[in-house]
């Protein structure tokens, strides 16, 4: 071993495979002989492996499948119109076991109604739902590829003769085969915008407004349980014995936005053009996050926090809120299509600044001639 300046023969290949000079000599002897068993029992009663396992072949499927479906319907009459569309996208995971499936559903519905000659109302509704499963390794706590690099020894097979996982498998692909460890994520987004447009005085006075709300819900469940394996017949051990817990995370975000403005324009005596606009906007967002972890799952297939009875309980919360609002105006005057005067002003407020610095006024004046 280079670690010991080549003065000693290593006794292990990382954590999961025993090594000795006799083992190396036996491997050399077997290299020219076919038909020998991949697994034997050594003098000490432990399994001894002579396999040729391609762990990446065990990890990945030969092929995967994805579906994408779209549908849309639209129509209109004299004073109404609508448009509805939907999409489903599903992608089967790449992994052979405990695979990383992904599903996405989107829907949008839009409609407009000309209530009166001077009033139009529109609505735009959007909904999205996503689910994703991310398998986990509990052995080293890292990604599957790192664990294969460390413990995916080609000599060790996936299973022992009695059907139990080998030590190398339990650290790598065998954890996926066991199928208990992973993170399930669900995300739902609902958004709706209602808008109105009104016009008066032969379209000289126009008022527009809209109101939007959006809710984002993110749920995540993480489950970690030990993975059983055998180093000798009839004896079960576990990888990740310190990890036996469930963690629920919920994050919700609520968003509101409102805008309204009106504008008036007219020309007097053919040379005096006047336009005025005034409006207001408001936005608000609230985020709340709750995370709870508890150990001591009473059985491996538990999927609810009530099925954990351990003494280790970790909780974590989070909350944020902000608001912004603003009022604005603009005045335009044009004389004889040659002289221009424009006055603008905004009063903006934001809760993201200290209480004595949350509001500010921003005026501007411009003039032109051609």
Model-derived segments and spans:
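Extended, hydrophobic alpha-helical segments in both membrane/secreted and soluble proteins
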Residues: 107-109, 209, 258, 325-331, ...
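Residues on the lipid-exposed face of transmembrane beta-strands in outer-membrane beta-barrel proteins
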Residues: 71-75, 109-113, 192-198, 260-264, ...
């Amino acid at each position: 071993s280079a670690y010991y300046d080549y003065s000693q023969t290593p006794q292990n290949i990382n954590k999961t495979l025993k090594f000795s000079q006799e083992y190396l000599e036996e491997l050399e002897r077997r290299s020219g002989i076919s038909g020998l068993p991949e697994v034997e029992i050594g003098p000490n009663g432990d399994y001894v492996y002579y396999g040729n396992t391609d762990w990446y072949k065990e990890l990945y499927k030969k092929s995967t499948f994805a579906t994408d479906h779209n549908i849309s319907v639209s129509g209109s009459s004299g004073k109404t119109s609508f448009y509805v569309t939907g999409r489903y996208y599903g992608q089967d995971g790449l992994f052979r076991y405990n695979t990383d499936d992904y599903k996405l559903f989107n829907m949008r519905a839009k409609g407009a109604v000309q209530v009166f000659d001077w009033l139009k109302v529109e609505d735009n509704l959007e909904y999205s739902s996503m689910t994703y499963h991310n398998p986990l390794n509990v052995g080293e706590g890292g990604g599957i590829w790192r664990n294969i690099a460390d413990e995916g020894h080609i000599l060790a097979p996936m299973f022992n003769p009695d059907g139990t996982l080998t030590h190398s498998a339990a650290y790598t692909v065998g954890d996926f085969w066991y199928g208990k460890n992973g993170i399930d994520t669900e995300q739902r987004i609902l958004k709706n915008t209602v808008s109105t447009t009104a016009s008066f005085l032969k379209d000289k006075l126009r008022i527009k407004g809209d109101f939007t709300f959006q809710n984002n819900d993110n749920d995540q469940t993480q489950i970690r349980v030990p993975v059983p394996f055998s180093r000798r017949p009839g004896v079960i051990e576990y990888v990740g014995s310190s990890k036996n817990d469930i963690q629920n995370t919920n994050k919700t975000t609520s968003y509101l936005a409102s805008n309204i403005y009106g504008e008036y324009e007219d020309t007097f005596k053919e040379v005096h053009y006047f336009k005025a606009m005034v409006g207001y906007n408001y936005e608000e967002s609230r985020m709340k996050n709750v995370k709870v972890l508890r150990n001591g799952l009473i059985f491996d297939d538990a999927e609810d926090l009530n099925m954990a009875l351990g003494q280790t309980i970790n909780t974590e919360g989070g909350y944020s809120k902000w608001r912004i609002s603003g009022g604005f105006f603009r005045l335009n005057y044009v004389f004889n299509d040659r002289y221009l005067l424009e006055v603008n002003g905004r009063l903006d407020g934001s809760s993201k600044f200290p209480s004595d610095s949350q509001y500010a006024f921003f005026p501007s004046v411009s003039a032109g001639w051609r």
